[in-house]
């Protein structure tokens, strides 16, 4: 009796012939389901959770990691004796060490907690997953399945909100972070993770895994399940439309094709085409069910279900047969690829030019962009019933700062005129209308004639919107600025870096204009900044050893290498432009992929160790570091719980500062501003904080020093804070607020007058103003002060001119001066007083606040008047002018002085305005508003 030849383990016979794998038991199905749920929970809470939530997840995962390392068998621990594992371990150890020397240990431990949770995922896969093709497939399916709910909930959250509503309640109950995320769609899916680009980093890996699962499915039921999984991941990935991620994804798919065995290449190619076509159709129709807020529309979910069904039908009844017919026809594959490239080029050309009217749906506006030459234009719109337009432009500075400058607002009921400046790079049109309104034409005439392309008939609306500014994209330019600033920070600590969170903490100290970002948007530069040359070397080693392991394993495991090669390319490729290696939504999945590389490809590089070796070189370092950080993070969580309690006392703050090495600065600062006055404790805390590099400590610490009468140290802290956060207008405004509280005797402490006995502090504060002027001269953007700041500076600059300095005159100036144009601040250095505005007409400004009207003009001056009383307005001018204080007209005599005093009640919060109507040719040389 003939026997069938034995099949090798893993479900694949010699020559690559696929065989049916044994179905997993119910217990194993339950285990994989629990693993997918656990990975999903870690992903969600590590991404959107508060720092407290991230650290809680991190410490729980670290406890699990400790148990795993203690009880894992020696053979399993030896799986880590391979270069890919060593590289990742080096990166983790450098990150761990950096939390103890980081400039901001608060940021560092939160970031490291995410890394700890991700490393726990890595160890669980390496130590508990079996080493075989079936085990690999199950692990890949678990990772892809963990991402699918994120995609499904993201689509639901921005449309019908049925699934996300109960999930949101549960997530918020466990930890804040999901209050309203994902509830809108503007040009792309915002996603429940709150960032389409990092979400795309997660879903791109899920899509690659899902593609591989479909082409390696051993049964029809597996194909159907994996096809549904693929469509959920692919549609949600496409709707996020992260152009950087999609660009890398295309390259990753090409790499997957190149690396795939010849008998799978046509299979994969047809699956890629099928998935792309179905996902594009589903996405294009689904967009109509999204809007600026939750729409309640079921269309996106219905289309997703329909897309899954269509893909399953195509998979079973079309693609399978095509694959069978086209097998072993490599030249045909090349021809098909060439044909698709040509068709794609033709389609793209047609899609960009076949346009028509635009009918508004649930979205309130859409944008279009044109590269228009400088000059005057008139825009005429045809709309039913009506539409609005807001026209803006971007110049080089706008691109760097990623903002726009408004030109004009208008409506379709009248022509809209606008002027494109000489330095314009791109002009944007934001059209708005009610749902159902149709904008049929938008024609412009002027320096160039033409029409704005409105409705792209062959492009999905979200794609049309995203491609508008490809030629002048502010995001791309601004990320270049982030990288440059990260390099500046790296130079302050080139070998070990500034510690995790070092970029977030220090970027304010090197900015040429104010912006807010936590990351450098390039992880190679981020690693260099945070962990120095050693950290970058470790990160590059992770990439290099992974590639090395894949190359060495390709002949033996071609199917596994084709997938992992594409995943590695995607992970490390998108790291060039996004923050995917810094956020909790991506890191657990990325570490899971690295675990698959270590387990299934790293064995070819495994170090040879004696049989008696128990893997202690790996086991004990990981165990010790895990135990140390379990203790440290637990102490941090205990301190944070006390700090957040309603019954917090000064003794609690001292205890928190003593047990928590990561957020001790917060407790010390809270102790000081809460009135802690134990002499040794308060002085020690203040001295400690005075040396901290922080973007948040200087102002409250200066307030503490001022409250105890140490004005010299208060001013030193303000100078230090202004230098460190030089581009932040809020810090400068608070700095001048504190100046005023310290030295202005009007409305402040009566004791403030003693600091006017001589001009020492006056000159220190004037020096602060001059520093601001220099900062504005050096930066791209100007730091402007509040009306209250400007009014205080008006008095301060007037006092500074007293020669010789006189205490009584200084007090009189602070008490009586409401406005004096001779001493108005001009922090931005444009020759115009910061409190002055030309409401109508045109004027030419001279020195000391004087100006000449070029045409009939209206000029206003804003001032904050602190004290109730009668005030005299005096306007010295070459001809008569009309004046008003607030809404009250003021009559002026021949000398320019008000004939009747103006009674001002005083308002320390709101500015009053002095309005002057000045005839053309008239020079106003001096304006004063003084208390009688």
Describe each PLM feature range.
Residues 433-461, 919-932:
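Exposed low-complexity, polar/acidic, P/S/T/G-rich flexible segments that act as propeptides
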Residues 162, 195, 460-474, 478-517, ...:
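TM-adjacent membrane-interface loops and short helices in multi-pass inner/ER membrane proteins
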Residues 34-39, 147, 226-233, 271-278, ...:
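Loop-to-helix entry and N-terminal half of a specific, functionally important transmembrane alpha helix
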Residues 149-201, 231-247, 254, 281-295, ...:
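Membrane-interfacial helix-loop-helix modules of multi-pass inner-membrane proteins that assemble, modify
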Residues 362-386, 414-416, 420, 425-431, ...:
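Extra-cytoplasmic beta-strand recognition segments
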Residues 41-51, 236, 526-531, 563-592:
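Membrane helix-loop boundary segments at the extracytoplasmic
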Residues 1-97, 103-107, 120-121, 127-144, ...:
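Transmembrane signal-anchor hairpin modules in multi-pass inner-membrane enzymes, especially those
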Residues 222, 533-563, 729:
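Hydrophobic transmembrane alpha-helices and their immediate junctions
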